[in-house]
Amino acid sequence: MNKSLTEKISAFIITKNESTRVARAINSVKNITDEVIVVDSESTDDTVAIAEKLGAKVVIKPWLGYVGQKSFAESLCVNDWVLNIDADEELSKELQDEIEYIFASHNQDRYLAYQIKLLIMHRNDQKPRMFAPFNKCTRLYNKKFASFANTVNSTTHDSVIFNKDVDFAGKIYLLNEAAYHYSGTSIEQLVTKANFYSNEQAKDLVKQGKKLSNFRLTTEMIWWFFKAFFIRRYFVFGVDGFVDSIIFAFARFLRLTKLRESSLKSKNVIASDYKERGNFMK
């Protein structure tokens, strides 16, 4: 852990059965942070042992949803400046150097938060491909002004939201260097994640009272395949990108079918209850 920076940084990572990837994530942040917090949702593999061996502070917490888990991990950080990465991500050496330079030169408070470019790394790749897709995410921020806990009406859309009284115009900076986001370890892992994540998303949609049209249900998978493969540029991964785009599109389709299933069950319960009351009144 880096003890030389005047303004300390806490890193936090949430995990569940990430024994094959958590070391890479921790090693990419431990040299630029004062502490690394790992909140583990009851892994059954060696995730906890690996994290502890690398010097991380591990806390076991039953699953609260993506937003709840990250909010809890954030609350454990002792420093105002916090850095969040997922277990399947890694800060490049260049990004580590950039962050360290900003904090060592006492320039971090010019902004309230920093965005990171997350380059998608296919599971079979050793280095980023040219024109690889990427996402821009706020991952380094001062938690006095922003937090994952500000996310409402969702347990899955985990993003850093500024406090309502904070004027953040011009106060977010996109870092020059990138981090790497590694895709699933296997087709099986991607499908398992798609099933789990679509369950969580469907629950959110039910809570939000979302309605579903037959048109959207029948076109959802086609649209999201097009978006993943062409707009998000998964075509740079060739056949593997084609396969992953189908799985991604299927996950989006699944969340709607599960929303529909939940809606039908609710209607059946209401109809059954109405029928029972009618029989009682006779």
From Swiss-Prot:
Similarity comment text for this entry: Belongs to the glycosyltransferase 2 family. WaaE/KdtX subfamily.
EC number assigned by the record: 2.4.-.-
Record key words, sorted: Glycosyltransferase, Transferase
Classification via InterPro entries: Glyco_trans_2-like, Nucleotide-diphossugar_trans
Lineage top rank: taxon: Bacteria
Record Pfam families: Glycos_transf_2
GO molecular function: glycosyltransferase activity
Upper classification of the organism: Bacteria, Pseudomonadati, Pseudomonadota, Alphaproteobacteria, Rickettsiales
Protein name from the UniProt record: Uncharacterized glycosyltransferase RC0292
